[in-house]
Amino acid sequence: IITGVITRVEGKNVFIDLGKTEAILPPTEQIATETYREGDRIKCYIVEVKKTTKGPQIMISRTHPGLLKRLFELEVPEIFEGVVELKSVAREPGMRSKIAVYSRDENVDPVGACVGPKGQRVQHIVDELHDEKIDIVKWDEDPAIYIANSLSPAKVISVDVSEEEKSSYVVVPDYQLSLAIGKAGQNARLAAKLTNWKIDIKSETQ
């Protein structure tokens, strides 16, 4: 992860000064909801370094899941120290993300550590990503529990899993159905991406 200052915008490419060198933020790695202005200081994730005749060309990203992962490592000492492990990240950049965390120490609440006192740790990351919503869920080796957690903030009644097909059937209370699915299916889509399971959601009366 690097911090730099935007020096110029040429066409759709944003150029960032890293001190001794310059990096390129191409349109494919930009967050659609962000505006990039000359003089702005931003954090980015290094995707690759290309060798060119003019020297190394550094390609950076604001959309890469690795950016979110590194921001949590910088903000949460428990992750940096290895007490809390970040198991999975799913992102729809600029909109919403989900991260799954696990604690190696039963006395440390992994979700609480990431949220921080008065929500300050996660808020710093949300601010850096210009109000991208972040759901922090507890990872579990039991897929049914993990899937139920991944659909947070929705409450789940039951989860049936098929290990062979890596698919699940989730029942939620009627009043929680739209929350579980999310706007334009976003919550369910991110939960499936986070857990790597197919998730079929139905309400209690369906």
Set out the residue ranges of the language-model regions.
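RNA-contacting regions in translation and RNA-metabolism proteins
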Residues: 1-206
